[in-house]
Amino acid sequence: FVIHLLNCSDGGVVSARPNQIKEELKIEDKAFGIYGSIVQVGRIIGTLSVMILLNFFNRKYLIFSALCLKSSTFLIYFVTKNYPIIMVFRFLQGFSHVFTYVYFPTWVHQFGLQKYKTVMTSFIQTASPFGSVFGFNATTFLGAFNYGFALLAFTILGLNLILLFMPDEYFSPSIFFYKNVTEEHEGRESTYSLFEVDEEKMKQKQAEKSKKPEGPSIWLQLLRPVFATIVLARTVIMFSFMGLHYWIGDYFENALGQDGKFAKASIYSLVSLLGPFLGSMTGAAICECFGGYTKKHSSLLCFVFSILTGISAIFTPMVDSLTYFTILLFLFFFFANCMMPILIGISFNCVDKKIKGASSGVNSLMCTFLGNLPAPSVYGFINAKYKDSNKRLAMTLNLNYIWVNTVLCFANYFFRLKEKTEEELRE
């Protein structure tokens, strides 16, 4: 968990000292935006290759190598300030990040105690927001972004050495399974391999599948307006979140004139942790009160939350008071995250069970391509062009982009209502 947390901390380091990074690398807002987006490109390429590499190479040494590579990308700032070279290492930083991000939750699922798996999986997912806050706070108090990166690099390397001395079986589910499966009535190791068990299960599943009627094709389901509008709605939220997280430090210093360590650290910690957590819990609870995300009214609930998020977005860039800014930003995160569990639930509910994995992959890929990837660069280009006349314009547009989500949530409600009516007419 600690390694996973540190692996997710680099975004917080960049957010804490944006102006310092621009000065050290001698770049402007446009280049700084691309500096953020290139990491997402690395993550996309890493995601496409990680599962292949994990299946063909020793997992322990692969994870060890990925963490060593990640640490080296943090230390490059002590060697050179050349922007093109830094960008290559930023790409590698995103590429190496994926290995632990993908494998550690899988490791918990394979080796975690059965009755604690859900808790352990949820716990390890908190590493991402906590890591971002840790990186932000550590860099804020250290005073320099390269010191923040150095702290992450040497801490990860130290913990990485511990992984190196762990037995291989802790990284390979097949070895672990083979060594520990026993036949109770004989008290000896089972002679059945994973492949034999999987083959038997596969035959059973194929027999069950042959009895079921064929449903709509995968692409027809993924291109349905109900699914497409939900995916795009999540993409809009991820775009606003990414732009906000990446540029929040710049906004603190240049628009609000706040460079105090305590103010920046406390506000970022509050809105980044408490807002999303309380929002997700509240949204899920309210949705359950209205019958859950399987009901068409859940889309209308997202529409209401989206309007409340949009109202917060309108006023957040208008205020100068740090207190009011904190309250409004908290409300923005709170109401936006009220939608997230409902949107995820609807996206799973509107496709057949057999393609839920494919729908999840499409959902994640779209959020990265249309949300996380372009957000830092788009914000940077707007900020570079208009910051002399309006330092808050980029943040205003980034936050109010959430109104597109409002339109999509209403459209989703309309399409679900239409499908329900068509089903009733057919019956």
Locate predicted features:
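Structural signature of the two symmetry-related core transmembrane helices
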Residues: 61-75, 297-314
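Conserved MFS/SLC helix-loop-helix module at the cytosolic interface between two early adjacent transmembrane helices
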Residues: 45-83
